[in-house]
């Protein structure tokens, strides 16, 4: 017995769709390197450790290179292939850590580290992708901390003066009440004596 035949439906993948998928896969393979930078601008303060985070996709083992572009020119920071030791420039030795995904971490940044950081991921000659991250490093404002310290010292001085004035007022009120009680006792005893004399 034959299985029933479905009219209008085809089973399996149509040949045209399969050809489209193969063509798309080949186009994607020929593109080479894809680079993703989640944060293109980073603000930091002095002495902070900063992660310049990136991620890439490629088919082979790429060469990753980071360059620093301050106001006066271009300076190479590091170059490496994932899984191999990094070639770190003398200016950033002991200040940079590399990761296999292409990210780098800068330790103890200073204002001089502000600028553009350019990453270039190269799979083979002619197949590369570049991206840029802007790093702005600012100093901690000690003048602001000084102002806050002076303000709190002034508040403490005002509090001490107010507490002292309250203590003086309390002592004056206590003396005034004592004096009033003493006068009241004197007048009461005087009245009692006068009543005794009149009797």
Curated annotation (Swiss-Prot):
Gene3D superfamilies: Immunoglobulins. Residues 28-146 are extracellular. Keywords: Cell membrane, Cell projection, Developmental protein, Glycoprotein, Membrane, Signal, Transmembrane, Transmembrane helix. The keyword Heme does not apply. GO terms for biological process: filopodium assembly; immune response; positive regulation of excitatory synapse assembly; protein homooligomerization; ventral spinal cord development. Residues 169-185 are annotated as: Important for CDC42-dependent filopodia induction. It is found in: Cell membrane; Cell projection, Dendrite; Cell projection, Axon. N-glycosylated. The chain crosses the membrane at residues 147-167. Residues 1-27 form the signal peptide. InterPro entries: CD2/SLAM_rcpt, Ig-like_dom_sf, Ig-like_fold, NK_rcpt_2B4_Ig_dom. The keyword ATP-binding does not apply. Residues 36-138 form the Ig-like C2-type domain. It is a single-pass type I membrane protein. GO terms for cellular component: axon; dendrite; membrane; plasma membrane. Cell adhesion-like membrane protein of the central nervous system (CNS) which modulates both the position and complexity of central neurons by altering their membrane morphology and dynamics. Involved in the formation of neuronal dendrites and protrusions including dendritic filopodia. In synaptogenesis, regulates synapse formation by altering dendritic spine morphology and actin distribution. Promotes formation of unstable neuronal spines such as thin and branched types. Regulates neuronal morphogenesis and migration during cortical development in the brain. Can homooligomerize through cis interactions within the same cell membrane. This is V-set and transmembrane domain-containing protein 5.
